[in-house]
């Protein structure tokens, strides 16, 4: 039969690239699960009353090439002016060796958060290096492996200061008036929900206020002034006030460490260590504190431990501080951080080393000195005598200066009264400085760069002597070894080989949606048109961004059934927080601010109660019935009991138990009946898109994990994006921004992230995904995700009971395998199975969530039948191994499961086990064998002997 031109054009070609099983394989799996078609399977599983009659109208699919061309044209509407705005964001030079071998490498960007350390040693080492950079530059004892951005790190510092403060009755937090405005914005938002009183004043007046538990200072103020706060910090410490200092990574290369001056907490952005501005993100924040406060720190901390053979190995330390364990009592709601960006910054430091970093920092400072000397020579006044890279220049005719700057395609900071701000960076050249002279002085200034250089080289006093660093930094060999590109390339590859990412195998983590991050989706994030924009540039220079964000928002509105979307939250946990704040402010607008009870099912993800606590709410747990569903009687009873104070319910759909609850609409109705709002967690949106929607179900607000459902890669633990969709009545209460208030922003509420659109530069990934899939492709993706999960459940249910199912024994897009009966019968645990899967070449499913003693499997639609079968075969083979233990063939204390994973060196070591070396290391054959580099980690040793900085190189070898 002759094909039409439309068929030959094959505009939906990407759908077949994204979805793993082809039509024939889908039919095989449908036959295996007893369904005629995808639509029939969906009809059996999803409650009839929430099924959409037609998919949301987000357009037809486009080819990869057509979508890239369309987005390139949109990106071309952005104007790339040279930015001197500063305010915590500068242009950078990302070394090409890091760009190509990390940022553009799926071996790095498709990995997951390193909960399974045996398959994560490479990125754990890179993160440990990041912590070492932070420790050296801040002068403190303990550092985390990144937070979301500088402003949220400031909010975390405030919360931590209150936790550790000995002044238990103090409720005031002092912020120096020259912190970045976006930092103050986010701090105020967080303080409101905690009930803290924020005082903003000149730092010198910090001692004038009583009942202050913490103080926030900025070492280099937002307009450039270097502050020597040593005396102030000493006095504050004598009053038992917790002192936090915001600092700049590049400035710290030359400036004295705040920790040496007595600061308790030091934080800031690592953006200028090689990470593009990206119109606001993603960027990693660094965070450090004194050792005595380590158990109160927020975020991931990488620690050095031992494996079962006694070898040095790395792991995430002190996880009992975190939301997935402590829930509403956690130090923070942080789940996703910024691992990929922290690793870029880490490797930037490795590549340049201390000598290279000092050269870069000194060059930036020298150019700033030259600029300052020339301007002063011509009669212009500088507001500050002490500076690193930023000048605050008083100008008589500010409008004329800004007009000349615009004509020269230059952005200066313009929000300072009767002055302009100018921040230089590592991309600044002497030609740029000459151009700045022209802008500020006119063309006839007659200044000579070489002459000015000689003058300032002989007599630079712009950094006060007391603030010059006098100690060595980055002395560890890792920062002094890999300075040629060949060495750096090999070092990065050696780290990558230690890890297991999607470029090697399926990562079947339940509740994580480890789907394909297609190359075509990733390409635009490094386009200069997207990568090089400052988040506070004039809006007319970011028209391409605004068009792309507007289109993406419109698509997400249609896909969610909501009325508006806010793009600011830069992680799922931040989205939860922002959504709950919208609910809180909505109630306050109706004079019902007393509503503070948040109902949360017992099965909820740990971020839910942690976010509710952070939003100033009290958590009341709702029971689940024996089938894993929300117990409607318990829900109704608690909603009625707390009717006067009911704020909301946080519910996940499909549930965290992996089923579509039949009564979800009734859940919404009960909560609404008693005056509450419905927060539907978007973690499992991959089983909704095109089939149903939160708005159609009856929810009021949801966050969307763009790093799950909409293809932003997990990056080994970040970046993420968590925009929120809201019904119209909540739209006025989503986050706003104090710096960028452009037309079309929905609100004037406080910010939850440093930048107005969060991590804007990764939004093109989700734009590309939706554009290439189209309405039908998105629905098919959800349906195949459901098919793949049911295929696994169907084939494994006789070996491992499936804990929860819905109608007709079906699951949603994930399934929970119950290991508890096997453990009781044989002594083999879910942990043993998880570690044995490594020997078979797989990352483990999610362990003991949402039910202890289980494994939750989510295959996603991107995995083909061959990979699903490989996983199923591995799980069945492991079940056979468990039977060998049960039969007494292998003793419980010495078998392939409890000794897993096995490493290469065991092949040539003395062998005393009752099973063969071949069974140990080649259970699935020799082809494409993944080799872990460490054996099972000793978690207890790691936390009892906490060590969170770089170890000797010999320990890695």
From Swiss-Prot:
One of its GO terms (cellular component) is glycine cleavage complex. PANTHER family: GLYCINE DEHYDROGENASE (DECARBOXYLATING), GLYCINE DEHYDROGENASE, DECARBOXYLATING. GO terms for molecular function: glycine binding; glycine dehydrogenase (decarboxylating) activity; pyridoxal phosphate binding. This is Glycine dehydrogenase (decarboxylating). SUPFAM superfamilies: PLP-dependent transferases. The lineage of its organism: Bacteria, Pseudomonadati, Pseudomonadota, Gammaproteobacteria, Enterobacterales. Its cofactor is pyridoxal 5'-phosphate. Its EC number is 1.4.4.2. The keyword Aminoacyl-tRNA synthetase does not apply. Signal peptide: none annotated. The modification N6-(pyridoxal phosphate)lysine is found at residue 708. The glycine cleavage system is composed of four proteins: P, T, L and H. The glycine cleavage system catalyzes the degradation of glycine. The P protein binds the alpha-amino group of glycine through its pyridoxal phosphate cofactor; CO(2) is released and the remaining methylamine moiety is then transferred to the lipoamide cofactor of the H protein. Keywords: Oxidoreductase, Pyridoxal phosphate. It comes from Salmonella typhimurium (strain LT2 / SGSC1412 / ATCC 700720).
């Amino acid at each position: 039969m002759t094909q039409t031109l439309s068929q030959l054009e094959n505009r939906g070609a990407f759908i077949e690239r994204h979805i793993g099983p082809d039509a024939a394989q889908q039919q095989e799996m449908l036959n295996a699960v007893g369904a005629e078609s995808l639509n029939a399977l969906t009809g059996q599983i999803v409650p009839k009353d929430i099924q959409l009659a037609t998919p949301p109208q987000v357009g037809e699919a486009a080819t990869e090439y057509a979508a890239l061309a369309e987005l390139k044209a949109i990106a071309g509407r952005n104007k790339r002016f040279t930015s001197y705005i500063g305010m915590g964001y500068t242009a950078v030079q990302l070394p090409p060796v890091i760009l190509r071998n990390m940022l553009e490498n799926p071996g790095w960007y498709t990995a997951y958060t390193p909960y399974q350390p045996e398959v994560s040693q490479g990125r754990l080492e890179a993160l440990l290096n990041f912590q070492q950079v932070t420790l050296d530059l801040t002068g403190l004892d303990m550092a985390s492996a990144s937070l979301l951005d500088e402003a949220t790190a400031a909010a975390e510092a405030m919360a931590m200061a209150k936790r550790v403060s000995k002044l238990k009755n103090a409720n005031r937090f002092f912020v120096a008036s020259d912190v970045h405005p976006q930092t103050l914005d986010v701090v105020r938002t967080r303080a409101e929900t905690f009930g803290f009183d924020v005082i903003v004043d000149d730092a010198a007046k910090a001692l004038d206020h009583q009942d202050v538990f913490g103080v926030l200072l900025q070492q280099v103020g937002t307009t450039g002034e270097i502050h020597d706060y040593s005396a102030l910090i000493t006095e504050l410490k004598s009053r038992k006030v917790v002192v936090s200092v915001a600092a700049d990574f590049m400035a710290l290369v030359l400036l004295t460490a705040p920790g040496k001056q007595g600061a308790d907490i030091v934080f800031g952005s690592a953006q200028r260590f090689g990470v593009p501005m990206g119109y606001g993100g993603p960027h990693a924040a660094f965070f450090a504190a004194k050792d005595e406060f380590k158990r109160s720190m927020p975020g991931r901390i990488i620690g050095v431990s031992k494996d079962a053979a006694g070898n040095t190995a790395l792991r995430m330390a002190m996880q009992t501080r975190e939301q997935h364990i402590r829930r509403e009592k956690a130090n923070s709601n942080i789940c996703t951080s910024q691992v990929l960006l922290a690793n870029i910054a880490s490797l930037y430091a490795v590549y340049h080393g201390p000598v290279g970093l000092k050269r870069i920092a000194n060059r930036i400072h020298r150019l700033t000195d030259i600029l300052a000397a020339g301007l002063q020579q011509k009669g212009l006044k500088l507001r500050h005598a002490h500076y690193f890279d930023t000048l605050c220049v008083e100008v008589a005719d500010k409008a004329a200066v800004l007009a000349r700057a615009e004509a020269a395609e230059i952005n200066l900071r313009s929000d300072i009264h009767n002055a302009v701000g100018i921040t230089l960076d590592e991309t600044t050249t002497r030609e740029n400085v000459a151009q700045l002279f022209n802008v500020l002085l006119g063309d006839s200034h007659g200044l000579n760069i070489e002459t000015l250089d000689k003058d300032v080289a002989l007599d630079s006093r712009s950094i006060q002597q007391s603030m010059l660093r006098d100690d060595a930094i980055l002395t560890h060999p890792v920062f002094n070894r890999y300075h040629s590109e060949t060495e750096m390339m090999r070092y990065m590859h050696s780290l990558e080989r230690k890890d297991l990412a999607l470029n090697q195998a399926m990562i079947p983590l339940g509740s994580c949606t480890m789907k394909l991050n297609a190359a075509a989706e990733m390409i635009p994030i490094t386009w200069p048109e997207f990568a090089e924009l400052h988040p506070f540039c004039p809006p007319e220079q970011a028209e391409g961004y605004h068009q792309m964000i507007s289109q993406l928002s419109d698509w997400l509105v249609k896909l969610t059934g909501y009325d508006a979307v806010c793009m600011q939250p830069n992680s799922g946990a931040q989205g939860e927080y922002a959504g709950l704040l919208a609910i809180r402010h909505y109630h306050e607008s109706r004079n019902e601010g007393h509503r503070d009870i948040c109902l949360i099912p017992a099965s909820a993800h740990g971020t839910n109660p942690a976010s509710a606590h952070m939003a100033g709410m009290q958590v009341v747990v709702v029971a689940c019935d024996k089938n894993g569903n929300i117990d409607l009687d318990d829900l109704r009873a608690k909603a009625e009991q707390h009717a006067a104070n009911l704020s909301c319910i946080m519910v996940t759909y499909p549930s965290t138990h992996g089923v579509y609850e039949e009564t979800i609409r009734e859940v919404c109705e009960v909560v609404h009946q008693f005056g509450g709002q419905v927060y539907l967690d978007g973690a499992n949106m991959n089983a909704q898109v095109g089939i149903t929607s939160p708005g159609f179900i009856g929810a009021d607000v949801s966050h969307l994990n763009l790093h799950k459902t909409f293809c932003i890669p997990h990056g080994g633990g970040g970046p993420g994006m968590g925009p929120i969709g809201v019904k119209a009545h909540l739209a006025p209460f989503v986050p706003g921004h104090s710096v960028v208030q452009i037309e079309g922003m929905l609100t004037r509420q406080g910010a939850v992230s440093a930048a107005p659109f969060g991590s804007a530069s990764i939004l093109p990934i989700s734009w590309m995904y939706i554009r290439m899939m189209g309405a039908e492709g998105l629905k098919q993706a959800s349906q195949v995700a459901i098919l793949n999960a049911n295929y696994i459940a169907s084939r494994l249910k006789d070996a491992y009971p499936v804990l929860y199912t819905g109608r007709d024994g079906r699951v949603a897009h994930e399934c929970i395998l119950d290991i508890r009966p096997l453990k009781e019968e044989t002594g083999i645990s879910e942990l043993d199975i998880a570690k044995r899967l490594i020997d078979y070449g797989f990352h483990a499913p999610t362990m003991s969530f949402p039910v202890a003693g289980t494994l939750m499997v989510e295959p996603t639609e991107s995995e083909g039948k061959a990979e699903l079968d490989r996983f199923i075969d591995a799980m069945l083979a492991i079940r056979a191994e468990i039977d060998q233990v049960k039969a007494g063939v292998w003793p419980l204390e010495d078998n392939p499961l409890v000794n897993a994973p096995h490493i290469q060196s065991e092949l040539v070591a003395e062998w005393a086990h009752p099973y063969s070396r071949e069974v140990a290391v080649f259970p699935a054959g020799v082809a494409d064998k993944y080799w872990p580099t460490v054996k099972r980690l000793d978690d207890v040793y790691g936390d009892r002997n906490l060590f969170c900085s770089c170890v000797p190189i010999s320990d890695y070898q």
